[in-house]
Amino acid sequence: MQPPKTHNHIELAFEIDSDLYELYIAVLSQEGIEYFLEEDKKLLAYLPESEWNAEKEESIKTLLRETFGSAPHFTASFMADRNWNAEWEAHLQPVEISNRFLIIQHQKEYDVKPDQIVIAINPKMSFGTGYHATTRLMLRQMEELDLADKKIMDIGTGTGVLAIAARKLGNRNPILAFDNNAWAAENAVENVAENDVADIQVELLDAEEEMVANLKEGYDLILANINKNVLDRILPVIRRHAPNAQVLLSGVLVYDEPWLKKLLKRIDYTNVKTIYEDEWLSALIEPKN
């Protein structure tokens, strides 16, 4: 696939203490914002230009006001497409997810432990560098699963890290990985090639109808490291159209666990295993039989 090469963004700048960064990231993720840079006394958040309007701005202010008691001042600036690689490479270091996984920058050498699985990532603006707790939680859950014969779909693939990890954990079937952001889909294609893994199909899919058409092809495991609002919308869809599939999800805050339990009960899923890190959780769920 060949997504567009030019992707303009809106940069939101929050001048806050660094000890609040993780909390702000958690809160802003509920608005579907997944791309951040941390600077001294300033948190930068990025979203596609096409998603920014007065309604989105007011929604963010309302969420911050409800969370913190007041809406902190932030600025919004237009950012033309540029060399995001240089931006990210200035901040990224290798990330040891566990004794099994090491995420590194592409084309750089690191000391690797025996039997450690290395994933090389060129993140650009895509989500899934290993720096966010949700990515680490998903990978730790995946380590414990027998993926060899699973037919896997990765929803909101970002950098493609989860699809790549599934292949490196021994999955033998074609994997479908898709995102609704053009730069993310493009980035995932690059990372799949960088890691020399075969049979990972990366697609730019924006409409729910396209997802449903693919779900009907009989997937065994759905990977969904996305935000609460999207999960609320698509989990019932997955339940209807992939009635036998397990779902491994993250992007849910710990304090939203009651919401998740209520949703799973309503759509007839059982929770197999939940793990936690910081303010985040990851849950492996499956249909009740």
From Swiss-Prot:
Keywords: Cytoplasm, Methyltransferase, S-adenosyl-L-methionine, Transferase. The keyword Nucleotide-binding does not apply. One of its GO terms (molecular function) is protein-lysine N-methyltransferase activity. It catalyses: L-lysyl-[protein] + 3 S-adenosyl-L-methionine = N(6),N(6),N(6)-trimethyl-L-lysyl-[protein] + 3 S-adenosyl-L-homocysteine + 3 H(+). Gene3D superfamilies: Vaccinia Virus protein VP39 (3.40.50.150). One of its GO terms (biological process) is methylation. One of its GO terms (cellular component) is cytoplasm. InterPro entries: Ribosomal_L11_MeTrfase_PrmA (IPR050078), Ribosomal_PrmA_MeTrfase (IPR004498), SAM-dependent_MTases_sf (IPR029063). It is found in: Cytoplasm. Its EC number is 2.1.1.-. S-adenosyl-L-methionine binds at residues 135, 156, 179, 225. It is an enzyme of class 2 (transferase). It comes from the Bacteria. Pfam families: PrmA. Methylates ribosomal protein L11. Belongs to the methyltransferase superfamily. PrmA family. This is Ribosomal protein L11 methyltransferase. The gene is prmA.
